[in-house]
């Protein structure tokens, strides 16, 4: 029997930010960032649980990061997990989601060790998570057999869409523990998840702030970035791009932006093809990191 497995839940059909797992932060996809963080958590096997439509688009990323890719139901995520668990004999599941590139892997390791200790020395623990982490930096730990049992007992659409509630919304049947996170992880006011385009831009700023650090980033590094003025008060340059003015102002803004990791905003209404041609000359690596805010069509 496999002791632990990691399952990263991933879909590409988000209505607020479609295909967000495939968006780039630097030169890697959001999904790759998540998988590399979760690889720091010791486990017997590592899986991505996706839907059939997304499978072909993420399989290569999974392979590159030594994750097995499993396809199942799109809407019934609980069934997707159970179907995966029916293919592997394991005790403990560590669940993360593919829209959280700044996971606290240290907290994940501590929480799974606590979960396993409780199941050795106390009454059975079916589900455990640390509360108080930044929104987007935590994971869930649960018993594989308990989740299978829960799935067989609920028809609640919410339970089937979100997995964990099948356990913790039925505390009369399952022992679920929400442990207040240790002080070093306890920053509930911070946000690291990617749910909207604004979140995505913020994630880029976090990665830029930490560009001289080794990824996966430590919890201390992520917290420092999230609390920095660089991330919370980004500088957006708005160059004068009126037709006939030439490209001098835009060139100066580009120089400042590439030197200081500022953003540039050029509204779609600006009819300045010569300036857009200049933007096209920016080296691709700079463009990836700078993430110009430009509504060029």
Residue spans for each PLM region:
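Short internal beta-strands
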Residues: 47-51, 262-269
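A short, N-terminal amphipathic alpha-helix
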Residues: 30-45, 58-60, 255-260
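Short, charged/polar "capping" segments at the starts of alpha-helices
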Residues: 54-58, 269-275
């Amino acid at each position: 029997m496999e002791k632990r497995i990691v399952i990263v839940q991933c879909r590409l059909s988000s209505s607020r930010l479609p295909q967000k797992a495939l968006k780039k932060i630097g030169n890697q996809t959001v999904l790759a960032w998540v998988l590399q963080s979760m690889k720091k958590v010791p486990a017997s096997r590592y899986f991505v649980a996706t839907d059939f439509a997304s499978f072909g688009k993420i399989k290569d990323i999974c392979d590159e990061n030594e994750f097995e890719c499993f396809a199942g139901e799109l809407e019934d995520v609980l069934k997707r997990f159970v179907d995966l668990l029916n293919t592997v004999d394991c005790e403990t599941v560590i669940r993360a989601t593919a829209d959280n590139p700044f996971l606290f892997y240290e907290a994940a390791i501590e929480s799974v060790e606590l979960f396993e200790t409780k199941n050795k020395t106390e009454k059975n623990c079916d589900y455990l998570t640390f509360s108080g982490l930044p929104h987007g930096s935590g994971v869930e730990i649960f018993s594989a057999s308990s989740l299978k049992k829960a799935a067989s007992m609920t028809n609640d659409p919410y339970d089937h869409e979100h997995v964990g509630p099948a356990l913790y919304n039925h505390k009369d049947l399952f022992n679920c523990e929400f442990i207040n996170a240790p002080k070093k992880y306890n920053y509930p006011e911070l946000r690291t998840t990617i749910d909207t385009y604004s979140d995505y831009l913020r994630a880029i700023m976090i990665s830029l702030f930490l560009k001289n650090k080794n990824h996966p980033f430590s919890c201390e590094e992520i917290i420092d970035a999230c609390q920095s003025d660089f991330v919370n008060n980004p500088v957006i340059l708005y160059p004068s791009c009126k037709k006939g003015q030439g490209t001098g102002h835009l060139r100066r803004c580009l120089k400042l932006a590439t030197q200081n990791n500022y953003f540039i905003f050029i509204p779609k209404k600006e009819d300045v093809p010569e300036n857009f041609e200049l933007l096209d000359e920016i080296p691709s690596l700079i463009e990836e990191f700078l993430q110009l805010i430009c509504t060029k069509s």
